[in-house]
């Protein structure tokens, strides 16, 4: 084309695109007679070049016919440039640039192919030369040495090996001008004809080196976008990995049958068939078939026992390892320390006795503190742990237990964790029920007892009477020839305290108390509570080992990490040694008093043990004894006859809540019983109020108060709060409320008895009975029971009372009278009438 032909010329016809799309309509038919009309368009694209013209034959064939000195593979035919589709939107310059790029890409691909072929030839020649040299050395070693012919024979081979690379240079140089002269040269461009390549697909486009506008070459045109899929796509990494895995599997299968892998299968008490198959790396269907052969028709989701699982594991050639759920738990009692690692520890002393006998006052005198003043009502309602340093520098740990009857479990807990029990008995009061209970707790725990006779300075004190009363409970003091130490003390005057400390030191020396501090810590929960600012807090008495900040532990059904340790003086410490009481912060929840704290290796182990214990506790709560039909009906009858008194209990510490629940359960009778909906330590929350509102139950708060949100809900739902700080005030008020639920007590007082002598009509419907009064008197309006042969016929009242024909109010014994009974006419001669009056009294529990 010339420039004049390329110039656009104006015509009188309107500008526009020729129609290249032919449209038609096709009807799609579906089921049930449905049809859909679809418009189909057929696009036509113009092709550059004449329809019958063949592609120009490149002159590279002449170069290809040149003799090659080496048997190199034939060069691939140069691909003729594909007639590019002419787009009406492309200009002539863009079409020429596209042709030039395609030619340049073909030329670069041919050069790259020639370079790779040359490298392969050189490598093959070098390998052949190396093989020939090794062969010559082997021949020289076996035969007689002939040095002259060997280099001469190898010279032609070396020359022949070096010849092919040198001969390929002229071929390539000859091919380049031939390729350049064969391509049709457009105006101001000299495209190069590409060598034919063996692969039919076009390679990835590469940037040309010159002669082209680079800014325009990188632009995305319509033609490039439409022909994008014609280029070769590289395989993704995922496809390569899949191919390698497939090849590896094919090699493994082709190598022969694989040897069966024997596994150690861990089998718990019960396991499903599918889970067992997964652990053995077998198919679940194979296990089901094996069980069917054993006569057990099961599915993969059914559970089998450990013995059946062992048969399956053995049959499939694996090894079994039996485990039990109980193995998850920690058995601290089986871990015994070596005697060489034990070191002396401080004695743990529990002070026990009856209420108001001066236990806390005695401990205050020993500590030099005033704990008793902080207790509500002057009585101890919490179990406290303290350490006292004696004059010789030794340390003694004291546990102060409540003396009230409601705190039985607290006293029992204190006796179980202690080494020595100090029984405090008031000299003027003697032994009381809780004193005797403390003696029984100490005997059950196998703990030695030291008797402290307190209040010897008070008038009416008689210590000798206390010693004599102790003989009734098999406690023989030293003054009477026994082995039980007793000390007369006065907490008020602080007399006899040194003797008491000496007695404790002597008893501890006899017992030789030791523990291993260089091991994981173990301790017992003395008390637990939910603090508003600190969260769950537990008072722990360390039994052995050393508890440190950061230790991970399990405490009952709760787990956690030690965030802080606080001693009995309120100071934070870094660690707690054996026999040391500390407050532990960092629990996941409030544990139960009496639980054991054990330090474990990691959090996963702690959570596993805690979850197992929670599951066991849930099973224990929800487990029910086998119920018979008779038992079911009797339970329903009891439930219908017994009134329930629901309560929600919140206390400051777990021990107090436990004591309140036990005290309220003792108030239950055959007619009414306490139903504890929820009992826990901590402040009264919104959930507590919501629970109480749903059942119309009062909320009992022991040394706790509700938050603002809970008070708001309580005012809206009309929920009652009962606040207490002394436990016997709480039990007294609850007993009154339970009695009020029952209503007044109905008491019957028999007034008189009479015998029916005759029956005669009285009016149209009623019958009158002629009576002889045998005992007491009969009055009008009283309640009466008519009996026949000692069987009650009717319960009624006396509607009318007459003597002869006169109405009277009362008839005494020995006289005859006539009565009309209300609501009954079933009266016969010989019946007996019992007259009584009803008295309503206020109930007491």
Curated annotation (Swiss-Prot):
Function: One of the essential components for the initiation of protein synthesis. Protects formylmethionyl-tRNA from spontaneous hydrolysis and promotes its binding to the 30S ribosomal subunits. Also involved in the hydrolysis of GTP during the formation of the 70S ribosomal complex.
Compartment annotation: Cytoplasm
Species of provenance: Sphingopyxis alaskensis (strain DSM 13593 / LMG 18877 / RB2256) (Sphingomonas alaskensis)
Annotated PROSITE patterns: G_TR_2
Region (G2): 378-382
Gene name of the record: infB
Protein name as catalogued: Translation initiation factor IF-2
InterPro entries in alphabetical order: EF-G-like_DII, IF2_assoc_dom_bac, IF2_II, IF2_N, P-loop_NTPase, Small_GTP-bd, T_Tr_GTP-bd_dom, TF_IF2_bacterial-like
NCBIfam families (alphabetical): IF-2, small_GTP
Biased composition (Basic and acidic residues): 101-140, 194-215
Keyword Metal-binding among UniProt keywords: no
Ranges for region G3: 400-403
């Amino acid at each position: 084309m010339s420039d004049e032909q390329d110039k656009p010329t104006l015509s009188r016809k309107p500008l526009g695109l020729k129609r290249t799309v032919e449209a038609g309509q096709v009807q799609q038919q579906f089921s049930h007679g449905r049809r859909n009309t679809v418009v189909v368009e057929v696009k036509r694209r113009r092709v550059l070049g004449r329809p019958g013209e063949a592609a120009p034959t490149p002159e590279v064939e002449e170069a290809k016919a040149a003799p090659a000195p080496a048997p190199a593979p034939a060069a691939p035919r140069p691909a003729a440039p594909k007639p590019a589709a002419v787009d009406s939107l492309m200009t002539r310059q863009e079409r020429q640039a596209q042709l030039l790029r395609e030619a340049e890409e073909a030329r670069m691909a041919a050069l790259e192919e020639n370079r790779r072929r040359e490298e392969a030839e050189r490598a093959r020649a070098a390998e052949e030369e190396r093989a020939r040299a090794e062969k010559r050395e082997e021949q020289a070693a076996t035969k007689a040495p002939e040095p002259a012919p060997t280099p001469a024979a190898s010279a032609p081979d070396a020359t022949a090996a070096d010849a092919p690379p040198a001969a390929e240079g002229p071929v390539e140089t000859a091919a380049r001008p031939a390729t350049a002269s064969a391509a049709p040269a457009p105006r101001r461009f000299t495209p190069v004809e590409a060598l034919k390549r063996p692969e039919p697909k076009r390679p990835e486009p590469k940037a040309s080196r010159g002669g082209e506008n680079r800014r325009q070459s990188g632009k995305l045109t319509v033609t490039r976008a439409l022909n994008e899929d014609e280029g070769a796509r590289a395989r993704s990494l995922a496809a390569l990995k899949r191919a390698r895995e497939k090849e590896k599997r094919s090699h493994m299968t082709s190598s022969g049958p694989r040897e069966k892998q024997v596994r150690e299968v861990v089998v718990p008490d019960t396991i499903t068939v599918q889970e067992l198959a997964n652990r053995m790396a077998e198919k679940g269907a194979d296990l089901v078939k094996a069980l069917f052969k054993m006569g057990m028709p099961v599915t993969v989701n059914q559970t089998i026992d450990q013995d059946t699982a062992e048969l399956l594991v053995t049959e499939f050639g694996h090894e079994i390892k039996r485990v039990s759920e109980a193995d998850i738990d920690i058995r601290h009692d089986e871990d015994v320390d070596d005697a060489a690692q034990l070191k002396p520890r401080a004695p743990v002393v529990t002070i026990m006795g009856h209420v108001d006998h001066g236990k806390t006052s005695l401990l205050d005198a020993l500590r030099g503190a005033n704990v008793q003043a902080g207790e509500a009502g002057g009585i101890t309602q919490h179990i406290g742990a303290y350490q006292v340093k004696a004059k010789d520098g030794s340390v003694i740990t004291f546990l102060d237990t409540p003396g009230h009857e409601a705190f039985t479990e607290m006293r029992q807990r204190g006796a179980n964790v202690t080494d020595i029990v100090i029984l405090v008995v008031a000299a003027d009061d003697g032994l009381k029920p809780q004193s005797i209970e403390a003696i029984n707790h100490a005997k059950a725990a196998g703990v030695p007892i030291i008797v402290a006779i307190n209040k010897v300075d008070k008038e009416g004190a008689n210590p000798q009477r206390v010693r004599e009363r102790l003989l009734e409970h098999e406690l023989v003091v030293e003054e009477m020839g026994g082995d039980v130490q007793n000390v007369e003390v006065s907490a008020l005057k602080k007399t006899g305290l040194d003797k008491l400390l000496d007695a404790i030191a002597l008893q501890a020396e006899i017992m030789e108390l030791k523990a291993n501090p260089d091991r994981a810590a173990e301790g017992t929960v003395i008390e637990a509570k939910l603090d508003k600012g600190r969260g769950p807090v537990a008072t722990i008495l360390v039994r052995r080992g050393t508890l440190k900040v950061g230790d991970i532990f399990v405490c009952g059904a709760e787990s956690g990490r030690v965030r802080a340790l606080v001693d009995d003086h309120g100071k934070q410490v870094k660690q707690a040694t054996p026999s040391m009481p500390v407050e532990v912060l960092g629990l996941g929840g409030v544990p139960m008093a009496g639980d054991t704290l054990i330090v474990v290796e990691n959090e996963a182990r702690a959570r596993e043990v805690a979850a197992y214990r929670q599951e066991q506790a849930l099973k224990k709560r929800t487990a029910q004894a086998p119920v018979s039909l008779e038992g079911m009906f009797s339970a329903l009858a009891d439930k219908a006859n017994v009134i329930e008194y629901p309560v929600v209990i919140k206390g400051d510490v777990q021990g107090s809540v436990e004591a309140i629940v036990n005290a309220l359960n003792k108030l239950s009778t055959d007619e009414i019983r306490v139903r504890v909906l929820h009992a826990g330590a901590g402040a009264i929350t919104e959930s507590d109020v919501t629970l109480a509102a749903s059942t119309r139950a009062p909320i009992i708060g022991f040394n706790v108060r509700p938050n603002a949100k809970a008070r708001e809900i309580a005012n809206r739902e009309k929920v009652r709060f009962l606040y207490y700080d002394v436990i016997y005030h709480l039990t007294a008020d609850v007993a009154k409320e339970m009695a009020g639920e029952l209503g007044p007590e109905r008491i019957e007082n028999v007034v008189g008895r009479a015998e029916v002598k005759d029956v005669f009509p009285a009016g149209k419907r009623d019958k009158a009975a002629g009576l002889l009064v045998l005992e007491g008197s009969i009055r009008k309006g009283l309640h009466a029971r008519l009996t026949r042969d000692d069987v009650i016929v009717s319960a009624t009242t006396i509607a009318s009372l007459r003597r002869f024909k006169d109405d009277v109010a009362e008839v005494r014994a020995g006289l005859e009278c006539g009565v009309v009974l209300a609501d009954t006419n079933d009266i016969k001669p010989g019946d007996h009438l019992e007259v009584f009056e009803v008295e309503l009294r206020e109930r007491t529990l």
